[in-house]
Amino acid sequence: SKGITGGYLPLSVVLTRDEIYQAFYDDNVTKGFLHSHSYTGNPLACSAALATLAIFESDHIIEKNQDKSVYIQAKMQVLANLPIQHLRHQGMIHAFDIKTNKPTFSRDCYAAALSEGLLIRPIGNTVYFMPPYTINETEIDFMVDATMDIIKKVI
């Protein structure tokens, strides 16, 4: 909820198809589906979001992330030598599953990564990469290479 404001304030955005919107819509606001909270319409959060979106556009963040994502995918091919499956990604989020029955894999992987200066998110047997958009190729190399070494140690 903070990403759209550049991390300054909580703000969320809801997107939906028109047919779903119409199912909840009513001209009478007392009968329509109302969803709001204390952050609704916060002008400072909205201003931060607009500034963040302007930076995304002027600095071509999406295009740069597409290139970074392709680089990450190519780099992750080194993991093919490990017992992994279901290598996948959506944008800058990359994930794969480790073939292991070790019940402490997630905890062991997290601790080993942290000791190497790497913050990764294993959930069960699934390892996720969700790098910041500012990541560079040297950092991507470290992220993937260190993860490969860590997995070898903990499985």
Predicted regions and their residues:
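Conserved N-terminal phosphate-binding loop of PLP-dependent enzymes in the Aspartate aminotransferase
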Residues: 1-155
